[in-house]
């Protein structure tokens, strides 16, 4: 799997490169050249650009790009947020090279005027600490309102590369070229929407540099997920692939358990049983007779079902009634592996406990209740939030949202880059819990089931969106794609 880095680790990679004999200015020239090549590839018809530079090394990257564009015949306007004498080190060398090529470096005019087809954002980069301050907030707002294409160098100015947080305001780019290594914050929360297309350029650094710097964050990819899926034996039978028990579906919410149960079956569980309100039995087993369905009036009705189960999924449509609480308590008395979703998480927040045999799958709102903080605090640093969740509750945690995160007892973080806005619809979480439960039933570890389940779920949604569009995408549209994805 692709590894993702924090800002401090990128700085360590830069230090190792300089110690090996690659100067800071050489790295800057490589960055500017990589970004210029990306600009030409994305906008080959562009004749004129405006390059917006800050006073640090990100501004220096922009100056290198500006010079290369100018020397290759483009019309180039370079603006500097600050005074020329404030540029130091490699950035000053980049400015000297611009001036040697007769490319002037200008102060930002009032009113702001951006010329050409493309604006290059080289204002702040990854060195920002705290919220964006003047004059950069004003400049970022102007770039976002200009209407031209935007290329961001390393990171859209205003984005925290470790967490993905928008630090007050941020540039909305069409294309971001990030340097040396992928930064973990660019794949979660609001950052993907601000990056646009994301390209990673290693600037020619050898693999030995990357082996020398440890990182605990991985990007989920098909080549890493596919080996987690067990091969099927020729002499297999339904008992070989486990028995999922899905519990939930309080009054008016029978569809939730129905979707979770079918999702478990679609990813290959051998048997799937639903335990729900008596009124919901017909809507579960009628249209999908492969699902066994039992009416549960009281917690004791679960005893024989739990005895037969391999894994329990509890929460879809569960509600928070006394009935729901009694069912959850009965499940927690067992040593079966468990997937908790939806209202089972809200009930858990009222009586927190720790276990190693569960997977918790909160969205940000549920995570806020589990941690006793605001939803904004969860989203401000999703990596910290999932770390706190795992420490408080143990087991495996899945923090849903853009760039879903997974964390287990190994302390590794996994980030899912797949998924799309069409998933913002009812039932998607029910499908995910069923997928994960179905994979646990097939003897995947809890951590592997969470990783594979999240990725397959998001990939199925992407395939469904490609087929019919994001708007109007239904959770059940994922079913045919699930079957294809688990049979690569």
Curated annotation (Swiss-Prot):
The keyword NAD applies. Residues 57-61, 125-131 are annotated as: NADPHX 1. Residues 221-488 form the YjeF C-terminal domain. Residues 221-488 are annotated as: ADP-dependent (S)-NAD(P)H-hydrate dehydratase. In the N-terminal section; belongs to the NnrE/AIBP family. HAMAP family: NADHX_dehydratase (MF_01965), NADHX_epimerase (MF_01966). (6S)-NADPHX 2 binds at residues 317, 430. ADP binds at residues 400-404, 420-429. GO terms for molecular function: ADP-dependent NAD(P)H-hydrate dehydratase activity; ATP binding; metal ion binding; NAD(P)HX epimerase activity. (6S)-NADPHX 1 binds at residues 136, 154. The keyword Lyase applies. Residues 1-214 are annotated as: NAD(P)H-hydrate epimerase. Binds 1 potassium ion per subunit. Its EC number is 4.2.1.136, 5.1.99.6. Residues 10-211 form the YjeF N-terminal domain. It catalyses: (6S)-NADHX + ADP = AMP + phosphate + NADH + H(+); (6S)-NADPHX + ADP = AMP + phosphate + NADPH + H(+); (6R)-NADHX = (6S)-NADHX; (6R)-NADPHX = (6S)-NADPHX. Bifunctional enzyme that catalyzes the epimerization of the S- and R-forms of NAD(P)HX and the dehydration of the S-form of NAD(P)HX at the expense of ADP, which is converted to AMP. This allows the repair of both epimers of NAD(P)HX, a damaged form of NAD(P)H that is a result of enzymatic or heat-dependent hydration. Its cofactor is K(+). GO terms for biological process: metabolite repair; nicotinamide nucleotide metabolic process. NCBIfam families: yjeF_cterm, yjeF_nterm. This is Bifunctional NAD(P)H-hydrate repair enzyme Nnr. PANTHER family: ATP-DEPENDENT (S)-NAD(P)H-HYDRATE DEHYDRATASE (PTHR12592:SF0), ATP-DEPENDENT (S)-NAD(P)H-HYDRATE DEHYDRATASE FAMILY MEMBER (PTHR12592). Keywords: ATP-binding, Isomerase, Lyase, Metal-binding, Multifunctional enzyme, NAD, NADP, Nucleotide-binding, Potassium. K(+) binds at residues 58, 121, 157.
